[in-house]
From Swiss-Prot:
Record localization: Cell membrane
Bilayer disposition of the protein: Lipid-anchor
Annotated protein name in UniProt: Probable serine/threonine-protein kinase PBL8
Subunit composition and interactions: Interacts with the Xanthomonas campestris effector XopAC/AvrAC.
Enzyme class: transferase
Length: 410
């Protein structure tokens, strides 16, 4: 693999070696540390932890996989690098199976680029879920940083929503994608060591051949607050138009910051509009500013639904989806639902539209007509001043203090 750290560093740290390093650095602040079970990189480390499910590749092997990074193999380009399509042949190395892959080559931008690369390896090396893109391997050779992912045949949600040459996604498919992405975020937030994704947007939601949504690009992910901490303080990073307002203003990051970003993406899926579009009239350039006041108005919300979805959904389904987006986009983070609430709210919507997807059979489905929450009747008396901007409370700590868990009563 070559050397991707200093000369006296091993190419890859084992978890045991990392634990020994941590004991030596125990006096450092929490933000500088990780333990073998925590998906957080060490700020002084230049090499990833080794994981049984993640393969270390040589640069020569990845050149072979991508035909020397041929320009016509490029799948996309972004701020962190270029992604190429590749194919692992079973003759490449003993024990490897033949499969198509996506190879991301990071820009050579020094420490910051390396840290983002290392974050992806250390998060995706540990986290496995049907709605997270699978990290197959990596390469760390000299100043080269590469990542190898499973190949996602359908590309990004962004392309399907906004490319004029792409057939528009149906209502049922959009709801299916929204649910899959929500499950991915809920998994991160509910992990033993919670993870804040920090860069949830349509270009980071990839679709496989069955349109299963998978979150990709974990370069900005952060370990969530621990113990009595209420938030993580960090430099503001992400994408304009998706970042939560309180995070932009203060640098205070919580799981509810991701919920806001989810609300923006859901709004993009409902309207077919970009979060920020400078080609539109000035009052319509910021999607949230333009659409959110209409989301809770039954007379206006149908005016903002993507016209390409005409006759594909029921009015009731549109109201439910718009109401969910409304609360996800609350200015007050505490009024936003938890991602687990979002999942329960979206599950019953899988049986609407063109009925290609079977109806959900969860308890949430049975209670959905009454507000979208299991055991709704038991909790109804705890909702007060129900309506836009209301502060609602639930006796169950698994529910959010606002949003779908208690407030979406009409």
């Amino acid at each position: 693999m070559g050397n991707c750290g200093t000369r006296d560093e091993a190419a890859v740290f084992t978890p045991q070696a990392q634990a020994q390093q941590l004991q030596k650095k125990h006096s450092r602040s929490v933000s500088d540390l990780s333990d073998p079970s925590t998906p957080r990189f060490r700020d002084d480390s230049r090499t990833p932890i080794s994981y049984a499910q993640v393969i270390p590749f040589t640069l020569f092997e990845l050149e072979t996989i991508t035909k020397s990074f041929r320009p016509d193999y490029i799948l996309g380009e972004g701020g962190f690098g270029t992604v190429y399509k590749g194919y692992i042949d079973d003759n490449l190395r003993v024990g490897l199976k033949s499969l198509p892959v996506a190879v991301k080559v990071l820009n050579k931008e020094g420490l910051q680029g390396h840290r983002e690369w290392l974050t992806e390896v250390n998060f995706l090396g540990q986290l496995r879920h049907p709605n997270l893109v699978k990290l197959i391997g990596y390469c760390c050779e000299d100043d080269h940083r590469l990542l190898v992912y499973e190949f996602m045949l359908r590309g990004s949600l962004e392309n399907h929503l906004f490319r004029k040459t792409t057939a528009p996604l149906s209502w049922s498919r959009r709801m299916m994608i929204a649910l899959g992405a929500a499950k991915g975020l809920a998994f991160l937030h509910n992990a033993e060591r919670p993870v804040i994704y920090r860069d949830f947007k349509t270009s980071n939601i990839l679709l496989d051949s069955d349109y299963t949504a998978k979150l990709s690009d974990f370069g900005l992910a952060k370990a969530g607050p621990q113990g009595d901490e209420t938030h993580v303080s960090t430099r503001v990073m992400g994408t304009y138009g998706y970042a939560a307002p309180e995070y932009v203003m203060t640098g205070h990051l919580t799981a509810r910051s991701d919920v806001y970003s989810f609300g923006v993406v859901l709004l993009e899926m409902l309207t077919g509009r970009k979060s920020v579009d400078k080609t539109r009239p000035s009052k319509e350039q910021n999607l949230v500013d333009w659409a959110r006041p209409k989301l809770n108005d039954k007379r206006k919300l149908l005016q903002i639904i993507d016209p390409r979805l005409e006759n594909q959904y029921s009015v009731r389904a549109a109201q439910k989806a718009c109401s969910l987006a409304y609360y996800c986009l609350s200015q007050n983070p505490k009024a936003r639902p938890l991602m687990s609430d979002v999942v329960e709210t979206l599950e019953p919507l899988q049986c609407t539209g063109d009925a290609l997807i079977p109806c959900a059979t969860t308890t949430a489905g049975a209670a959905f007509a009454m507000g979208g929450v299991p055991d709704y009747r038991m909790h109804r008396r705890f909702a007060k001043n129900v309506g836009p901007g209301a502060i609602c409370r639930s006796p169950n700590p698994n529910y959010s203090p606002g949003g779908p868990a208690a407030c979406r009563v009409r």
